[in-house]
Structures are given as C-alpha cells and as structure tokens.
C-alpha cells in the first residue's frame, strides 16, 4: 500500500513538472504548436451595408484569451520548481525501492552454499515391503513395479519385464532401504 501511494505521488509530481515545463499547457499537448495561418478564400463582393450588419455569432472572450497569452512571462522560478519536483520524485522513488531494514539484513549463521552443491547428508528413501514373500517389492504404479535391490531403486515393467534404474537429476542411482 505504501509503495502504491508513493508511486502515485511520484507520477503526480512528474506530470506536474512536465506540464510546468511546457508552460502550463497541460500534458496532452505534444509540442509547441501554433494555429496554422490560412489564406482566406476569395469572397464575392458584398455591399457596404451587408458588411456592417454581419457580426460574429459569439466571441467567447477572444480578446481576453489573446491578452492572457501575451502576458504570461517566462518565470525563471519554473526551473527551480521543476528541479525541486524532480528531487522530491527521486527521493520518493528511492524510498519505495530501497529494502526495509528487516529485508536488508540476512541471517549469517550458516555460510551460503551454491545452488549446485550437494547437501552434506544424503537422505536414503525408506520403504515398507508390500509382500512378505518378496521383500524387495516396495511399490506399484499402473504397469510398473518398484523394487529396492542392493540399496538401489529399480522400476520393472509388468508387460515386457524391462528393468530400469531410478536416477536423480545427476544420473546417480537413488539409494533406498526396505523395512519390514
């Protein structure tokens, strides 16, 4: 939740800095654009009275808009405000991405082992015999029987009596032992 709030604050600060840098025109404008000056189409000649009677439908304060556009000074404080906004956004971002004290400290009781290192203690799979007359038979799954012979695990196919050793990911036979 803290990260979400901080991210939204960073986003808001960044957007305000961008809009301020563009001169307060907002984020959606994609550059310094000016209205295209077009050449008016030739109009048929009108009489003097018709020209005087024609007025625009609405002005929508065009005079006020032109005055405010020319009166906006380039304030040198905008650079300072943009810098302060960027610094605040960077600080918030570093606070969000930095680990907490509990995450940064790892237990150093035991040295770390590489991922491919063999464990010190090898575990031996222990099975209970399924049949007292055949103590090596320790399991069955569908068409295959599982046997523990001489401390190694073997699979035997029931249909063609094909035997295969069960190995681990390093092609070593899996050790096993049988209990009664």
UniProtKB/Swiss-Prot annotation:
Point out the signal peptide segment.
Answer: 1-21
Q: Does the keyword Signal apply?
A: yes
Task: List every stretch annotated Disordered.
Answer: 23-81
Keywords associated with the record: Signal
Composition bias, Low complexity: 27-78
Name recorded for this polypeptide: Uncharacterized protein PM1449
> What species was this sequence derived from?
Pasteurella multocida (strain Pm70)
